[in-house]
Design a protein with these regions (language model features):
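Catalytic cores of nucleotide-sugar-dependent glycosyltransferases that transfer UDP/GDP/TDP-activated
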Residues: 1-201
Length: 201
């Protein structure tokens, strides 16, 4: 277990992940962190409350932060429902997750040396870190690594995806040759373009 091994060498590891619908809150002893929750993220002109829950992996002495929102993650899986139908708002979910993680790290006043992004749901984080959050003390000196997995979605993202992901500090030029509709390969390429290192499975 890589995070545990790094933690045992005296480094601090914090894990952030979406609070998928199949995660049992009672069994895993998740609890909401009120001081971190309560912020609204505006995506596509709509307010979405950011709820932060935390659990501990006792054996590794490591905390896991769960990014939650009733609309995007409650009772929902990673990419598709139980019938294999992909969620139409996967693009908004990815925007919410990436921004939710970065806002939580800011609130924690934590300055990670390395931010390791795993899979397509994290693909917007490298762009946000290098452009929209580049002057934030938490991210100013951080290196970003993106791991590509075979966790692809089959459909394209919504036609207004580029507009949804825009934040202050990001220009259309920063999106390079991102053409809509955006598919899995184009989304991963955007992540790779803004990462300091890439790991391919």
């Amino acid at each position: 277990n890589l995070p545990q091994a790094i933690q045992e060498k005296g480094r601090e590891i914090r894990t952030f992940m979406p609070k998928w619908g199949n995660i049992n809150e009672r069994r895993n002893q998740l609890h909401e962190v009120i001081r971190l929750s309560g912020m609204n993220l505006i995506i596509d002109d709509t307010d979405h409350p950011l709820i932060i829950k935390v659990a501990s992996i006792q054996s590794a002495r490591m905390q896991v932060y769960f990014i939650d929102n009733d609309d995007y993650f409650q009772n929902r899986m990673q990419t598709a429902d139980e019938n294999g139908v992909e969620y139409e708002d996967n693009d908004s979910r990815a925007v919410f997750y990436a921004r939710g993680v970065l806002e939580t790290v800011k609130k924690l006043r934590w300055c990670p040396d390395v931010i390791h992004c795993h899979g397509w749901m994290t693909a917007l984080a490298p762009l946000y870190i290098k452009k929209a959050y580049k002057d934030e003390p938490s991210f100013r000196d951080a290196k970003v690594v993106f791991s590509v997995y075979e966790d692809d979605f089959k459909n394209t993202l919504s036609d207004d995806f580029a507009a949804k992901l825009m934040l202050k500090g990001i220009s259309k030029k920063d999106l390079g040759d991102l053409k809509e509709p955006v598919d899995y390969a184009a989304l991963c390429k955007l992540a790779v373009d803004y990462s300091d290192g890439v790991i391919q499975n």
